[in-house]
Amino acid sequence: VYNGLLSFEFDHLRCASVLARIGLGWMFAALLFVRFGWKVRAGITVLILVGYWLAMAFVPVPDAGGAGPFTLEGNLVGYIDRLFLPGRLHETVFDPEGLFSTVPAIATAMLGMFTGEWIKLRKEGLTDRNKVLCLVGAGAVLLIVGLLWSLVFPINKKLWTSSFVCVVGAYSVWMFALFFYIIDVLGWRKWTLFFTVIGMNSITIYLAQRFIRFS
């Protein structure tokens, strides 16, 4: 419906979407969560990011026409979309929420799961303040890895590159640590009602802007 299903013009229907990426990313992350322990899942996350980089950098695209592997016309994500994704691509030859670029989005979901597991962990001597410090350190590691990786695999949201996953993951972990410290550790909760309502209805608000003119 959001992308025009009820128009019944299926040649112009865009099948990919932000919500589909969120759903698929979390679905596969959840399947891994119920099947494997955190160490195996951490290894799978690394394999996803490294494998995606190697595929994007070194798998040739037959119809690239000499364009580079990270360009609009020459990237592997767009080639797979043109082969297998039905309907309309958002950018004609490429869709930023396409099939192959959803694979590293699973790693993004996994980072969120690891963060939640860490916060919920109960261990003798592990205080909430210690958890915050560890999250800050984890964010620093992610940022350094992402920036170094970007030298050979540019930070690119539309391609959801592995360096993008690391850098955005770092900022997200830091923001989570900040609000966890303020709200849960210090107990400053009175100002949070507005943001709680927004957070609990984020998908509704995202969809509403498509149908309601707020301006």
Where do the PLM segments sit?
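Alpha-helical transmembrane segments and their immediate juxtamembrane cytosolic regions
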Residues: 1-215
